[in-house]
């Protein structure tokens, strides 16, 4: 059913924001399956980002980065700037898990902040500013 996309997208996205690994592992694969079945690229990108965050939280860093990059590529092709910025933020978070990647984390957070400011996504922009301040 069409509304299943919205339900699983909301559940997966909320689990991602809450950093709830078990919920991400439960809902993100279902969202991915529905999005692939129905060729819904936006929801597929959201599923890939959620899976990437789940993999990062689970210590699967190589797989995580690949999923996040896939999501960013999809959102870029769609011109979905808010989703692009949210994914750039997650790539910044990913880089924070790698001690030698602080410079790259700053770059991703800065790119995310630029997009958040451009679209006036104030709460996201403030969260990103906080992440940047934490790097100082």
Predicted regions and their residues:
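Helix-coil-helix junctions within alpha-helical repeat/solenoid scaffolds
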Residues: 1-136
